C-alpha cells in the first residue's frame, strides 16, 4: 500500500492533507522520516505520526481517569465532554462503555467496539462495578446486610441485585454492584436515608483504574484487560 493511502485510511484525512503531513516531516516508517506519498509499505512496516504508531486494523479500547465536571456525551452546551480530552483521530466513532455522572470521577471505558461495550453494560451479563463512596452521614450497622438483600429504589418495584459493601470509615465505603440503573449508587444510599457527597468508580469487571493516570489522562487497555470482559 502507498504511504499516502495508508495515512488517509488510518487518520481519515484527504489525499491533500496526507501530503501536507508528509511534508511536515512528522511521519516515519520504521524510524525513518518519509515524505513521499508513493512510498510502498510492507506488511511489517511500522508507521508513526508525531511519535505515535498508527494502524489500520483493530478497534480501540481506552481507559480514562474521568475528572469532575466532565460529561459523558459527544456534545454538551454547558460542560466539557470526556471525548475532548482524547488526542485521537475519528473520535466521533467512539462511545462510552458505561457512562458516569458529571460529578462522578474515576474509571471510564471508551471504545468503538459495540459488541464489547454491550458486554460491559448489558444487565444480562451482570458486569461488576466497584465504587468508592463518600457519605454525608455515618453508615449504620445494618447497611451491609441491606445491600446484600437488595435495595428498593424509589419508583421501582423490584429490588436491586445483591451488592457488596466494604466499610473503609464511618463515612467512606467501597460498593460493588452488578447492574447499572440510572443514578443507582446515589439512589441506593438515598433509600437508606443517607446522601452521597462523593463518588469514584475504581473497577469494571477485572479492569481496575490505573493508579498512574491523573484526572483527564488515559491509556489504551492491554490485551488481557480487553479479553477479561468476555470471561
Swiss-Prot record:
Span of domain S4 RNA-binding: 1-67
Biological source species: Vibrio cholerae serotype O1 (strain ATCC 39315 / El Tor Inaba N16961)
A Gene Ontology term for the protein's cellular component: cytosol
Top-level enzyme category: isomerase
Entry-linked SUPFAM superfamilies: Alpha-L RNA-binding motif, Pseudouridine synthase
Record-stated family: Belongs to the pseudouridine synthase RsuA family.
Protein name: Ribosomal small subunit pseudouridine synthase A
GO molecular function annotation: 16S rRNA pseudouridine(516) synthase activity; pseudouridine synthase activity; RNA binding
GO biological process: enzyme-directed rRNA pseudouridine synthesis
PROSITE patterns: PSI_RSU, S4
Keywords of the record: Isomerase, RNA-binding, rRNA processing
E.C. designation(s): 5.4.99.19
Annotated Pfam families: PseudoU_synth_2 (PF00849), S4 (PF01479)
Active site residues of this protein: 101
Record field: catalytic activity: uridine(516) in 16S rRNA = pseudouridine(516) in 16S rRNA
Function: Responsible for synthesis of pseudouridine from uracil-516 in 16S ribosomal RNA.
